[in-house]
Amino acid sequence: PMLGPLVLFIIWDLVVRFKLIPPILLPSPWTTLSTLFVGMAGGSLSGDFAYTLIRTLEAFLIAAVVGVPVGVLLGSNERAYRSVEFVIDFFRSTPSSALIPLFLMIFGVSDINKVAIAAFGALLIVLFNSAYGVINARKQRVMAAKVMGATRWQIFKDVLIWESLQPTFVGLRSAVSMSLVIVIVAEMFIGSERGLGHRIIDSQQVMNVRDMYASILAAGALGYVLNIVFLVLEKRIVHWSGR
């Protein structure tokens, strides 16, 4: 798994050494990594990292707590889901960044705004995947439960919920990544004083490219770690999927 990053850093180093890109625009990878490690080991970068992480987790938790149960309930009644499917698909297809002015009007320039717009974008992903997980549950297992005399409630809690776990986890994994993306975009453009997004755009404006690239690497590392965490959780909790 380290081969890809190693190749990337070698290419990056060669580009800098042969001055294919001016050093003022692209510092060496080793200088960037040094800035990253110093900043994360007690520098101001660690504080901005923490702000972005907290906002991302807040947005994700709101999306998960609301999206999973609502998605499962809608999925258990396909007619109810079809009645709101257009609205869900419409907003799911709308770039969340296009909704920033709307959220600015509602919440103003505040941390709540950043969390709210990220939670909204992530919520639609969770809701969609949870609902479709229930709708597309294996018909054989549902029929087997009916044959054994299970009630609708028993089928819902013992079959449909478990059948929806894998697509729900796929939705959660996508949602946490979406939360991070939207939070960073919001930090860039919604009057933020702290956070990786603010740090990236601020560094770019003053041509502090080492700090800019270090912040980008920190954001990428955060997204990668969050994705790996959910992959591990999915494998442990839904290990029986497909059997």
Short names for language-model regions:
Residues 47-55, 105-126, 164, 169, ...:
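Loop-to-helix entry region at the N-terminal start of transmembrane alpha-helices
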Residues 78, 135, 166, 170-173, ...:
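C-terminal transmembrane helix and the adjacent membrane-cytosol boundary/short C-terminal tail
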Residues 105, 134, 182-219, 242:
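Glycine-rich helix-loop "coupling/hinge" segments at transmembrane-helix boundaries
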